[in-house]
Each structure stands twice: as C-alpha cells, then as structure tokens.
Design a protein with these regions (language model features):
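Short linear motifs in intrinsically disordered/low-complexity regions
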Residues: 17, 63-65, 75, 114, ...
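Cys-His-centered catalytic/binding microenvironment captured across papain-like cysteine peptidases
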Residues: 26-27, 123-159
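Ser/Thr/Gly-rich low-complexity blocks that favor extended beta-strand/coil architectures
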Residues: 42-47, 52-61, 80-122, 145-158
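N-terminal, intrinsically disordered, small/polar-rich Type III/flagellar export signal
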Residues: 64-70, 103, 108-117, 127-142
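N-terminal low-complexity, intrinsically disordered "leader/linker" segments enriched in small/polar
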Residues: 1-68, 156-159
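Short alpha-helix capping/helix-loop boundary micro-motifs
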Residues: 74-85, 124-133
Length: 159
C-alpha cells in the first residue's frame, strides 16, 4: 500500500482554490518546470497570489495536557483538562507525548477531534491503525501530551 505525499500538477493547478479539503494538508505538488507548492488552508481573509505566508501560532494552553487512561492499541485519547477546542482544530496535526515512563517522545497524527468549550473530555482520534504503542496513565504527574496544529492549516500573511 502506498501513501504518497506528493503529486505532479499541470501548469495552472497552482492557482486552484477549493471550499472543501481535497488533499492532506501539506501535500507537495510539483509542476513540470520544477516549481513546488504545498496544499494549505488559508485562515481569515483571502491572500493574494505571490504573498508570503506563515503558519498559525501555536496555542499555549494546549501543551502539557493531562489525559485519561488509555490502553496500548487504543485509537482514541481523551483529554481530562478543561479546554476550549473547536471540532477538528487539530485534524492532520499531531499529539506528542511529553512525559511518562517509556512514552516520552512518541508522536501520533490526529485524524479528528471533538469540540469542547471550557470543559473536559475532548476526544482525539488518532490516524494510526495500530493505535497507541504503549498505555497512557491518567492523572497529573503521569502522562502529559501536547497538541500541534498542522503547519499548513490556517496559514496567514507573514507579519
């Protein structure tokens, strides 16, 4: 099975815009002359052709988050801290494990997430068939995770 992260396009494809997602964010497209473009989602106002853009800033309160217990092989992780997160805010982004014996340094791609508003219980669905490599333990001082949006999500004009 193949999972290409690059496509080849014809001249003019770099100008295509869509109102719904057609590729994985960050997909690399190369034109016949060697120019390369990345499939991105624009945040806020329209951006003129040729403008230099940058990734959205990270969300400070979405680091060092406490999780509910999860078993090895699980494909969902529930965050137990009080958060405000919109539905699929972290889609195509990453969950990285900050702490916990034998777990620190692991990273998982996020397939989707539920919305919560100043509440606990945001559920992350991992984009990994085999699920978690090791179990996660609940409670402060045990497993803590951080969330990162996809670099190509909600790009903005460079400041």
């Amino acid at each position: 099975m193949s999972f290409p992260n690059g496509i080849y396009g014809k001249y003019g494809f770099e100008k295509d815009t869509t109102s719904s997602q057609k590729h994985v964010l960050g997909t690399r497209m190369e034109l016949p002359d060697g120019r390369v473009f990345r499939y991105s989602e624009i945040g806020g106002a329209d951006i003129a052709a040729g403008a230099v853009v940058q990734a959205a800033a990270g969300v400070a309160h979405d680091q060092d988050l406490v999780v509910a217990a999860a078993s090895a092989g699980d494909t969902t992780v529930t965050l137990s801290g009080s958060l405000t997160i919109t539905k699929d805010q972290y889609k195509d982004g990453y969950m990285h494990i900050n702490s916990g014996a034998g777990r620190a340094g692991q990273i998982y791609r996020i397939k989707s997430n539920t919305a919560v508003a100043s509440a606990t219980g945001c559920v992350l669905t991992l984009d990994e068939e085999d699920g978690l490599e090791t179990a996660l333990t609940a409670g402060s001082g045990n497993t803590e995770v951080g969330l990162s949006v996809n670099t190509y999500s909600n790009v903005r004009l460079q400041q």
